[in-house]
Amino acid sequence: PMFDSNHVFLGIAPIGWCNDDMPELGGENTFQQTVSEMALAGFTGCEIGNKYPTDPAELKKALDLRGMRIASRWYSSFILTRSMEEEEKDFIANLDFLEAVGANHINVSEQSYSIQGKVDVPILTGGHKHVMNDEEWDRFCKGLNRLGQIASERGFKLCFHHHMGTVVQTSEETDRMMSNTDPRYVFLCYDTGHFT
């Protein structure tokens, strides 16, 4: 075998069935169809999508029936544009949900100044994407470390998801973020589809 399936688990995001940013893409696909097809394809884990039940017990039951579990959940942070008190409160609520469904990873993407959902705004040209200054980098990395520490104290790994149209999009921005955060608390969710 290519890998030991007792130690390596393959998960998938539901974006191939329904798109959270553009719900009309895959709008006809139900939650039940999505997770059933994931399981039939051999995946044992998945991220949470917009059609998933919001009740942890209902979600866990549906996945248990298919031999699956939640691998992670996307969390939109706003470290640069709201207070850390608000950020921590929302982050902890997401950890509570993930804990209830048996997950131990959370994928974080900084959405302050994001243009990812603006289909009429170019991401790579025209200077539309926000570029952080040194002060913003400091605030961002300290905030990310704080969220990572909270996650770690609860047995979670915070995995940062670089994303097109956000303040951490390029390889240089990703390198700077990783170099200025604590490796005990901040991990990388490497996305080849979004790396520029």
PLM segments and residue spans:
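Active-site-proximal loop/turn and secondary-structure-junction residues that shape catalytic pockets
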Residues: G16-C18, N50-Y52, S76-I79, E110-S114, ...
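Short, well-ordered alpha-helical microsegments
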Residues: D55-A57, T174-D175, T196
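Active-site acidic/histidine proton-transfer and metal-coordination neighborhood
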Residues: M84-L188
